[in-house]
Amino acid sequence: MREIVHIQAGQCGNQIGAKFWEVISDEHGIDPTGSYHGDSDLQLERINVYYNEAAGNKYVPRAILVDLEPGTMDSVRSGPFGQIFRPDNFVFGQSGAGNNWAKGHYTEGAELVDSVLDVVRKESESCDCLQGFQLTHSLGGGTGSGMGTLLISKIREEYPDRIMNTFSVVPSPKVSDTVVEPYNATLSVHQLVENTDETYCIDNEALYDICFRTLKLTTPTYGDLNHLVSATMSGVTTCLRFPGQLNADLRKLAVNMVPFPRLHFFMPGFAPLTSRGSQQYRALTVPELTQQMFDAKNMMAACDPRHGRYLTVAAVFRGRMSMKEVDEQMLNVQNKNSSYFVEWIPNNVKTAVCDIPPRGLKMSATFIGNSTAIQELFKRISEQFTAMFRRKAFLHWYTGEGMDEMEFTEAESNMNDLVSEYQQYQDATADEQGEFEEEGEEDEA
């Protein structure tokens, strides 16, 4: 089987990671003790992707939980599925990273990283044929962003040919925990551009808007936001966990989604949007799902896809539905909105259908878009970064951990390059291909 090793780092990563395991354990019929109580063979057919079968028919998540302070992991351990994880796979320090990327990446995190890599090796060795790694973390803090990116580069060194996939929670101005988020995020993106194959950008601002506008929650909590994240993560990984009519693994997804290696930042979406507690039992039609899924209000990143163009799109439909209808609807969307899809990648929308819907829904759809509009998100962080960096505000916290200003300048320009690469392909048309390629080559040099 093609296994995936899951790593969750930092407070945010551990919270959305724990939620993800709750949701998929439920979908696979696995209770908090790791025993199977399901009702369908499909639940077990590809269970090995995310779970290891231990003695006594117990299923143990291939999950590694990492943090620089014990707090969050204690709450995961005492949470609803806390006992399902392998106790040796909790790796934590005592010092904390204090929302400082340099502490996570160079000092505190660097001290802990070897013990994490030991666990990564142990998990990878128990795999039959490891396909890759997935990391859940945030980019605004210290541990998830600093140590998370350190782990990625170390794992990359050791497993260069395995896929590296991240679910990265991007900071947003409306939902800010820390004033140095733009620094931490820029330094992280600088790493992610080079070292990951697929990054799902999940944005707190977009999640708040969804909770507020669509779900009519007046005071959304992190629990509500994480509910949306886990629904999206469950949808995105459906093809990896269940047999479907169009099966996917991480590599196939990457091949379909990433036209240029640096442009691998995806905008996830989900339909139908339901709040916790009020899961709707009314079945949506395929046209409604398709329409909702492409709606800007359903995107989990605060970017408007109408401000850019889609390079590639993958859609995952779940539930019993007619493949023919799905294909018709997807073509319909492309024909009606053809100006929003680049014409120089002819069949750039892929659709997968999985028969098992998520809990409480008859059918659902998950959207993964590689859109040039994601540059809005990077621009937003970059502007905030520049505003502070121009005055060298807060820099002493980073230089005190041994960082150099040069690294900030490099990260800043790498992020700006990324924005202009997205812009370049947004403006590109099919006919000017000749001159366009030469430009590209100069850029590389």
Curated annotation (Swiss-Prot):
It is found in: Cytoplasm, Cytoskeleton. GO terms for cellular component: cytoplasm; microtubule. Mg(2+) binds at E69. Its cofactor is Mg(2+). GTP binds at Q11, E69, S138, G142, T143, G144, N204, N226. The modification N6-acetyllysine is found at K58. A motif (MREI motif) lies at residues 1-4. GO terms for molecular function: GTP binding; GTPase activity; metal ion binding; structural constituent of cytoskeleton. The modification N6-succinyllysine is found at K58. Its main location: cytoplasm. The highly acidic C-terminal region may bind cations such as calcium. Dimer of alpha and beta chains. A typical microtubule is a hollow water-filled tube with an outer diameter of 25 nm and an inner diameter of 15 nM. Alpha-beta heterodimers associate head-to-tail to form protofilaments running lengthwise along the microtubule wall with the beta-tubulin subunit facing the microtubule plus end conferring a structural polarity. Microtubules usually have 13 protofilaments but different protofilament numbers can be found in some organisms and specialized cells. Interacts with NCKAP5L. The MREI motif is common among all beta-tubulin isoforms and may be critical for tubulin autoregulation. This is Tubulin beta chain.
